[in-house]
C-alpha cells in the first residue's frame, strides 16, 4: 500500500513540474519578444513593417 501511494505522489509531482516549466517558457517568450522589438528598432530597416513581422511570428507559433 505504501509503495502504491509513493508512486502516485511521484506522478503528481511530475505533472506539476511540467506545468510549471510550461508557464516559465511562456514568460520567457514574452520577455524575449520585448527585447527583440527594442533591438529591431535599431537594427532593422525602416521599410520593413514591424506589425507584419509580429503577426507572422504569432501565426507560426
Swiss-Prot record:
Protein name (record): Sperm protamine P1
Similarity comment text for this entry: Belongs to the protamine P1 family.
UniProt-listed InterPro entries: Protamine_P1
Keyword Translocase included in the entry's annotation: no
UniProt function note: Protamines substitute for histones in the chromatin of sperm during the haploid phase of spermatogenesis. They compact sperm DNA into a highly condensed, stable and inactive complex.
Keywords: Chromosome, Developmental protein, Differentiation, DNA condensation, DNA-binding, Nucleosome core, Nucleus, Spermatogenesis
Subcellular location: Nucleus; Chromosome
Sequence segments annotated as region (Disordered): 1-61
Tissue: Testis.
Annotated GO CC locations: nucleosome; nucleus
GO biological process, one term: chromosome condensation
A GO molecular-function descriptor: DNA binding
